[in-house]
Amino acid sequence: MKTHAIIPIFIPHEGCQNDCVFCNQKKISAKAEAMPPCEIKNTIETYLSTIDRNITKTVELAFFGGSFTGLPIETQNAYLSEALKFKRNGKIDKIHMSTRPDYINREILENLKKFEVSVIELGVQSFDRDVLIASKRGHSVEDIYNACNLIKEYGFTLGIQLMIGLPCDTKEKCIQSARKAALIKPELARLYPTVVLDDTELLKMYQNGTYTPLSESEAVDITKEMYKILAAADIKIMRVGLKSTDLICQDNAIGSYHPAFRQLVEGEIAKEALEKQLLLKLSDSSFNKFHFESNSFSFSNMIGNCGVNKAYFKDKYPDISIRFSLNNALADYVYNVVEYKDI
C-alpha cells in the first residue's frame, strides 16, 4: 500500500551556470518551458485530487530539473510561496528540492527555512578531487563538506546523490565516496550509474576514445558495494539508476542504463546473502534440500530480475534441491536459507 506521494514540479535547469561533461540539461531547457509559479497551484490541486489522504501519510512537493538555489532569488521565492500555501493548509507535508554543493550558503538556507523547505538533496556525484575535475563539476570536495554541514546545522533533511563511472573514476573511488557519504550521515541517498547522453561533452569523449563507460555488470558490481555501505549506515536509498524518459531509453543510452537497474543491484545483494548462508549450511550438514525464503516485498529480488538468481543456483548447484518460498515473518531485504526434508 502506497503511503508516500510525490507531486513533481519540473523546473528547467536555467539556474545552473556550470557545464558538467555528463549533463545536457541546458539543451533540454532550451526546448522546455518552465512552469510559471502561477501554474503550480493548478498542478498541485490536480495531483491532490488523485491522492487518498486516508491512506497516504506523507505528500511531498518536489522541485525537479536541476539546481533550484541557482535560480534568481525572486524566482525561488515565487515558487516557494505557492508551495508554502499548500503546506500551511495541511494539503502537503514536505517541500523538497535538489541543488549543487556550491549553491549553498547561510543566506540561501535562511531563505529556504523561511519557506519551510524540508528536504535538500545535493548533487555530490563524487568525493574524489580528480573525478570532480575530470567531470568539470566546478566545485571542490571542501564545498561538498561545507554544504552538507550547513544543511544539517540548519535542520534540513539531507540527501546525497552519487554517480558511478564518471571520467577518472574507479571502483575503489566509488566505494570511498560511499564511505565518506555514510560518515556524513545523510538521511537519503540516490545512486546513478553514468549514462552518456546526446549533446554532452561526455558523448564527444566517448566518440574520441577518451572515455569508456562501464558495462552493465561492472556498474551493478560497483553500485552493489556502495548500496551495502549506505544501507548499513541506515541511509534510505531513494533511487538506484536513472528513470526512463524520452531522453533516456534502452535504444539510445550509452553506458549502464537498465529500466530495472535497482532490481539488478538488489538481486545481486540477495544472491550474495543466500549463497553465503547456503555454503555455511553445506559445510555443516549433509542436507541437500533447502528453502530460500523472503517476504513478499523482497521475493522478486530473491529470484532475481527475470529469474536470474534461480538460474544461477540451479546451474552452480545441480545436485541441490532449492525451493524459493515466501515467509512474511521476515523483514524487507532479509533472506533466509532453511533445510527441509520430504515427508
PLM regions and their residue ranges:
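Short helix-terminating capping/connector loops at secondary-structure junctions
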Residues: 53-58, 89-92, 283-287
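Conserved non-cysteine loop/helix-boundary elements of the Radical SAM core domain that shape
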Residues: 28-42, 50, 65-187, 191-194, ...
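Short acidic/His/Gly/Ser-rich catalytic and metal-binding motifs that mark active-site loops
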Residues: 16-20, 197-204, 248-250
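Canonical Radical SAM [4Fe-4S] cluster-binding loop centered on the CxxxCxxC motif
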Residues: 2-39
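Short acidic/polar active-site loop segments enriched in Thr and Asp
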Residues: 59, 93, 118, 187, ...
